[in-house]
Amino acid sequence: MQEEVRRLAEDARRERNWKRWGPYLAARQWGTVREDYSAAGTSWDYFPHDHARSRAYRWGEDGLLGVTDRECRLCFGLALWNGRDIILKERPFGLSGTEGNHGEDLKECYFFLDSTPTHSYMKALYKYPQAAFPYTRLVQESLRRTAADPEFELADAGVFDGGRYFDVFVEYAKAAPDDLLVRITAANRGPDAAALHLLPGLWFRNTWAWGRGGEEYAPKPSLRLTPERGVIADHATLGRFHLLAGRGPDGSAPRWLFTENETNMGRLFGAPSASPFVKDAFHEFLVNGRVEAVNPAGVGTKAAAHYALEIPAGGAVELRLRLCVGEGGAAAGAAAEAPDAEAALGAAFEAVFLERIREADEYYAATLEAALTDAERTVARQAAAGLLWSKQFYGYVVREWLEGDPAQPAAPPGRSQGRNHEWFHLHNRDVVSMPDTWEYPWYAAWDLAFHMIPFARLDPVFAREQLVLFLREWYMHPNGQLPAYEWALSDVNPPVHAWACWRVYKLTGPRGGRDRLFLERTFQKLLLNFTWWVNRKDLHGRNLFTGGFLGLDNIGVFDRSRPLPTGGHLEQADATAWMAFYCTTMLAMALELADGDAAYEDVASKFFEHFVAISDAMNCLGGTGLWDDQDGFYYDQLHVDGRHIPLRVRSMVGLIPLFACEVLEQEVLDRLPGFSRRLRWFLENRGDLAGHVAYMDSAGGNGRVRRLLAVPSRERLERVLRYMLDEREFLSPHGIRSLSRVHRDHPYEFNTPDGAHRVAYDPGESTTGLFGGNSNWRGPVWFPVNYLLVEALERYHYFYGDTLTVECPTGSGRRMTLAGVAHEISSRLTSLFLPAAGGRRPCHGADPRFASDPHWRDLVWFYEYFHGDDGRGAGASHQTGWTALVLSLLEGQARRRGGAAKDTGQPTGPGGRKGRT
């Protein structure tokens, strides 16, 4: 058995706590809702970046490429100073939502290079300029620019020109679950020798200053310096740990600095601080030369080893540290028994790193598809690394947050009825997969569902645990709603959680060997969520749904999360289609569970009939439902003053109806007599519903009979696909656009008493301020919906087979089966990350460094979305996150090249796993 597989098994059985330590330290805690105690809910202003170095956080911690335990009690991270910066670099910098010309925006260059699922080995890279970091210029230039202008990035300031920067590599390797080895390599890429102050640090999250008791609020812990054993960290629930620091390249020991993780009240508020030694002491010591800022007694709750380095041109230095359990902790490791730091950081240290790197390579060699090319494997490995590095401790207890803390100033009046007050039950204190480590350091429920598809390949147990977690009673609302994200927990995201549960169930074992208990647990709780949707979002009981913005931010004519300026209401093609998709997914889950428990046959019948009712409403209610027969497309409909007005915007809203597609196999139905009887009765007695669209048609193949449940009939499917596969409309060189390119020359306008509302093709960053302006669904390519389209097309092909071919691209004369179309879209999506002519990856735009510089060209960012014409990445740059779905797409392509999907004709899905096996 591979060592990493063994570690995963030991952790799953709770025999050894291999996942106790990981990259769970946030990249940004400032500017978040959970740190906001303002009266107006102005999170960015209440806790800005300028406060972060001086102010203790209430709900978490942040740092630079750091680690922490799963409860974020003890943290380790880097701090850097080049002798020129105005502040000590302790965390990544970026613009707030009000500073960026497209909303919040990271202004750093760091990359996640490797990680195993247990974090037994991790590697990341931070590129640190040798010139003064241009904090002020980045803010001022971004404020000067409009939403129509490109963003001003760190590289645009010239700080990487001539190679005048440091590549700072951080590696972690576990000798044992509580024995973490740290290797830091700083390489000078410039032509001259340059100074670098490097401060690896250890600190406790402040849980003692709030006046609360209970399991989350242990007594104040301590760090203290010992001559032989480095820093000793004592914590009431974590136990005792040692941090050992090796000598610098000149043979000298680092200078240890100590302070308290307490707010500098004097600097921020003109009030006395709880301690003379405060959070920003190391900044004051280095940048401002205030020696008295650090505690000479060598005690505190925050410590750092200060290395003052001079690195020659083209040279590199290596530093070694080790965080290990000590006496007072369980099962002290070899490092704790070593006579001194040098022994613990010597040959055995090097051997552990060599072993863990070898094991990581072995794990991915066995886990990733063998047919991946070297270029594809580079992308896949970094996508996996980004996904694993994006696990973060997330703490947020709404009741305590609304009340305020006993030892802090009283909460502002009205806070008890402010943001998220309906979620008084929410009690989050978990490691959760984040959309992006800096721009979105808070969970988003529908993002997380997509994360779990590639996660199921890497760590099936974690994938299942995350999906169950969001259905537990301390997350899910008592009424059945899932929490959206901290900015507005009651916002409505697309109902994809059931799909993720079903896909993860199928991906994590062969038929007969899957986790049926997981499927039952999630199905039972999803029934509550489905009922919430039906009761809250089907306003008139007609099976046509509203839902708000549904994660697609600015895609609509109106801000769909607010009351309409016209009055009336909106029946949304996407909301209704999402519910049809929800029905088919729950039907598939119920049929699986019914094969072994007949009680589920009744609920399977319920979801079958509910799907048919929704599909009928979408296609036929009032004549043609939300279908526009003139255009051959699905549109939102505005209902006002007795009129039904289609909003003729060709967008992803009209493609989402394709997602709802499920094939019923006769051999499955034969094992379910109760469901089959009800199905026969329905077909024979409800001809008004069963006979008017093609989704009830039968198809044969190899003697098998199948039935297709889908929203569009075959004829309507073909009409929609003509738009979707037209390069003048949706089909881009790198996937399916979120808005048709036809709206570039023909914007859609709708006039209301408050003015004209206009939707135009906008292929890159948003040129409007809707939803903060940092997201855009009016043209760019987005991975989650593209992934679902690819899956749906493979299911349609499973039913129609070679009897249905379409032109791809439209007008080209080249005909493909729907499986061929799915593979074409998948190939276009993965091409975003693969080197093309001249070594350029489309996702990196025109930046020549990423094409030809040996220190940049193999590095990949996984952006939030991609320019609808040229594929340039936009939005968040570390969205692994759902853009890690590229890992599943690459694997699917590799399997097809290897011929593994040719035997049965069953859909493999983009990740290469057979659909209903």
Regions found by a protein language model. Give the residues of each.
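Active-site-proximal polar cores
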Residues: T68
